[in-house]
Structures are given as structure tokens and as C-alpha cells.
A protein has these predicted regions:
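Conserved short alpha-helical segments that host acidic/polar catalytic motifs at enzyme active sites
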Residues: 47, 111, 190
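Gly/Ser/Thr-enriched, mixed-charge loops and adjacent short helices
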Residues: 14, 34-38, 43, 154-193
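Short, glycine-/Ser/Thr-/acidic-enriched flexible segments
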Residues: 50-52, 57-59, 96, 124-125, ...
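Alpha-helical scaffold segments in soluble metabolic enzymes
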Residues: 25, 68, 72-75, 128-132, ...
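Ferredoxin-reductase
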Residues: 9-12, 82-161
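Eukaryotic N-terminal low-complexity, Ser/Thr- and Lys/Arg-rich leader segments
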Residues: 1-5
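An N-terminal, well-structured beta->alpha segment
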Residues: 7-106
């Protein structure tokens, strides 16, 4: 699908007012390069998770790209279930724009997939997530942070059960699961509260 077709799909599917305003602004700018930059690719998931500029589009950090990544992680975890016991996930976030929203989005998707998550109730540094992931015996840890990047960025870092950044073979398996998820039709979710 080309960039303009993806843009049109997002205009049809997105209900979040902030993202709708961003989409409208792209079109009103009259600059096709703005739309192309937001939609020319999908944010790539790797050993460090996702990281990108905030805003509407497949090449941006937003509730839809976070939801898609989390659904892929949920599918990965549920495919690894031992003895019928679902895995658990620890989640923390920093003070960046939308970090708490993205953490709650991830928890909502995990819950809808039968996965319990432990979400810190307030801002936490990365070592707190590493500790919680190990201490609670979680399958995965998710840290919503863009680390050292400028404020227009946010990120979604994934840690293994050892509290460390995931290995490349796990990142590859999660990437494959994410690629099989349609961000508008396949993401299961429920209210956070």
C-alpha cells in the first residue's frame, strides 16, 4: 500500500482526537513529503524495541503502533506458555509525552490477551523495570522511554526474563509476530481501569 493510501486508511480508522488533528495537519500542509515520512515504513522492532517521533503514521510512535507491537508480544508470550500458565509482564514509563498513555495501552492489550501485567503507578527509571522483571518472574519487561533522544521522540523498550535487553533471536520472533498483526483489526484491547 502506498503512503497516500495508508494515510487515507488512517483518516478512516483513527478515532483519537490528537492523532486526527495530526492527520488533518499533514493534509493541510500541502506537502506530500510530510505524509510520506509518516507512512513510508513501519517502525522497526529490534533488540532495543521501538523508537520514533511521536505522531500519526506507521513510522511514528502512537497508540496504534504501540498496540500492534504489544499484540505481537502477547502472541509471542502466549505461544511460549508452559503448563497452561500465561506469562506476566512488568511495565514502567518515564516522563516523556504519552509515556503513561503508552504504558496503559500496552497493559490493556496484554490484559485482553489473558496476560497479567504489573504497571508501576508512577515514573520509574530503567533499573526498576529490570529488577521488577526478574523479581516477579516476568516473561517480558516493557519500558516506555526514548532514553537520550530529543523530546519529540518516544520509545518502547523490551527486556527478557533476566531483566536485560532481549536477544536478537527473541527480537526476531517478536518481529515476526508483530508483522502478522493488523494494527486496526487484530489488536485486542480492554479498558485500563
Amino acid at each position: 500500500m502506498d503512503c497516500r493510501s495508508l494515510y487515507d486508511l488512517w483518516c478512516e480508522k483513527v478515532t483519537d482526537p490528537e492523532l486526527q488533528a495530526d492527520l488533518k495537519g499533514m493534509d493541510e500542509s500541502g506537502d506530500e513529503a510530510v505524509i510520506e515520512d509518516a507512512f513510508y515504513r513501519t517502525l522497526e522492532f529490534g533488540t532495543a524495541g521501538l523508537r520514533g517521533v511521536l505522531g500519526a503514521g506507521t513510522n511514528r510512535m502512537n497508540i496504534h503502533t504501540v498496540g500492534q507491537a504489544t499484540q505481537g508480544i502477547a502472541d509471542f508470550i502466549n505461544g511460549q506458555v508452559n503448563d497452561g500458565e500465561p506469562g506476566t509482564v512488568a511495565i514502567c514509563y518515564d516522563s516523556r509525552i504519552n509515556s503513561q498513555l503508552f504504558a496503559h495501552t500496552a497493559a490493556s492489550v496484554l490484559a485482553a490477551n489473558g496476560i497479567k501485567s504489573y504497571v508501576y503507578p508512577r515514573l520509574q527509571p530503567t533499573p526498576a523495570l529490570s529488577f521488577a522483571t526478574r523479581y516477579l518472574g516476568c516473561a517480558i519487561g516493557i519500558n516506555v522511554t526514548a532514553s537520550h533522544n530529543p523530546s519529540k521522540y518516544n520509545g518502547y523498550k523490551v527486556y527478557g526474563p533476566d531483566g536485560c535487553q532481549i536477544a536478537s533471536e527473541i527480537a526476531d520472533a517478536i518481529t515476526k509476530a508483530i508483522e502478522g498483526v493488523d494494527m486496526f483489526d487484530d489488536v485486542r484491547t480492554m479498558p485500563f481501569e
